[in-house]
């Protein structure tokens, strides 16, 4: 999962993340429904690995979201990028229209926030962006939420001397054996229920 100020927002105003505690997204994000309690996650800032953990909780809430769109009447798509130095400030990736002010639209979305601070293990800078991309199941993907090849990722961490981080994560991942009140199957460590 990509976090931080360099996270591509495209047609929206961004997300509130604190990489070592929680990750935020909504129902407009590709793979939005694929994060669950018990999932192992690796979080990076598009430059380097920040850390790994296990999802402890996923909160859901309805919200109004401001979406930014291309103002070209023939386009109206959300694939816009804000430029840091060039003017006009925005460019549409779909129709190449350049503009200073995007069209805004309000949409009701489901917001999600996953908590993962209990097992957070900082591995800041241990793997660079190119190395992480090669460890994804779809190496060319540009999505913020991507599936990792976990055995390959674990091997890469172990080759850097961070094998203890993988063991810590393995110890925190629950076995899915009984139904909790939220219909998520969880076994509490040490056999308590």
Positions of predicted regions on the chain:
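Loop/turn positions that initiate beta-strands
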Residues: 37-41
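Short beta-strand-centered aromatic/proline hotspots
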Residues: 49-59
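Generic domain-boundary/flexible-linker signal
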Residues: 52, 64, 103-106
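Short, solvent-exposed secondary-structure boundary/capping segments
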Residues: 59-71
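Compositionally biased, charged N-terminal/linker segments
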Residues: 1-35, 68-101, 107-119, 125-128, ...
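Short, charged beta-turn/beta-strand-edge "cap" motif at the junction between a beta-strand
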Residues: 30, 42-51
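A generic structural signal for short, solvent-exposed coil/turn residues
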Residues: 45-47, 62, 84
